[in-house]
A protein has these predicted regions:
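Extracytoplasmic small-molecule ligand-binding "clamshell" domains
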Residues: 28-95, 188, 263
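A ligand-binding cleft/hinge motif common to bilobed small-molecule-binding domains
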Residues: 77-78, 95-104, 162-165, 193, ...
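Hydrophobic/proline-rich hinge and linker segments of small-molecule sensing/allosteric domains
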Residues: 32-37, 107-137, 241-244
């Protein structure tokens, strides 16, 4: 009986080893990037093809590392978890470095800067940040002009994170010291396009999202516009997330980013999608 059990265990160990080798061999020459391809011009799809700033930068990184790039299009909120679990080698989706995210993954050096802006319907009573917040003499928010305001965001993005905070931290919610939200004014959608559709149908009063996708949404939809002037909601840096234990890949990505910045590749990619002449 013991011999049979030992034989079974040995066979199982051999199978596990062979599977591990097969798995490693399958991905040996491939980098799997997790993204959410609904965030133009950083990542989007044309037919079956992936396009955008992040896609082209990721491709350039893969080429630097002598790898093939494979792209997994997933919900934004599942990217970090998938990178943690090893399903994906890295996540790249117009992703901002935050303290909360740093608890789960590491981030590369910055490769682009994003601005969170406010989209409103034409004729909206919201004409500036002053239309949303009540400010003290120091310019800090102390309350809302309209406590019934509803704000649309793409769930799990930094727009969602920022808006979900307390009003005194430039959020739109009432939040207790322990983090409990007592009044939630944020309406979360799976994509920015859904949030914009909600704005057009009057379900939300405004949408807060990155400036570049915002410009694409406004161009594709009549009757909405971005608040202009000094009305940016937040300014942030984008980076690539990597599993904490995968320090070797992080170092390789940072080295590739430095070289691609130095030789002008990243600048040309960004200029292609966001011309400075616009």
């Amino acid at each position: 009986m013991k011999k049979i059990i030992s034989l079974i265990l040995a066979v199982l160990m051999i199978c596990a080893t062979l599977m591990a080798f097969a798995s490693c061999g399958k991905k040996e020459d491939t980098l799997v990037m997790a993204t959410n391809a609904a965030f133009p011009p950083y990542e989007y799809k044309e037919g079956d093809s992936f396009k955008g700033i992040d896609v082209e930068i990721a491709q350039a990184i893969a080429e630097k590392l002598g790898k093939k790039l494979e792209i997994a299009d997933v919900e934004f909120g599942s990217i970090i978890g998938g990178v943690q679990e090893g399903k994906y080698d890295f996540g790249m989706a117009g992703m901002t470095v935050t303290e909360k995210r740093l608890e789960s993954v590491n981030f590369s050096t910055t490769y682009a800067t994003g601005i969170q802006v406010i989209i409103v319907a034409d004729g909206s009573a919201i004409e500036s940040l002053d239309s949303i917040f009540v400010f003290d003499e120091n310019g800090d928010p102390t309350g809302l002009q309209n406590p019934e305001i509803k704000v649309g965001v793409q769930q799990d993005t930094t727009g969602d994170i920022y808006c979900s905070d307390d009003i005194t931290n430039w959020g739109l919610n009432d939040v207790e010291e322990d983090g409990t939200i007592t009044t939630d004014r944020v309406v979360r959608y799976k994509t920015g396009a859904e949030a914009v559709a909600a704005l057009k149908s009057g379900k939300v009063d405004c949408v807060i999202i990155d400036n570049e996708p915002a410009k694409s949404f406004v161009a594709a939809n009549e009757g909405i516009h971005i608040l202009e002037g000094d009305n940016e909601y937040a300014i942030e840096d984008y980076a690539i997330c990597v599993a904490k234990e995968n320090t070797a890949l992080l170092e390789q990505i940072n080295k590739a980013l430095a070289e691609l910045t130095e030789d002008g590749t990243i600048g040309k990619i960004i200029e292609k999608y966001i011309p400075t002449s616009n």
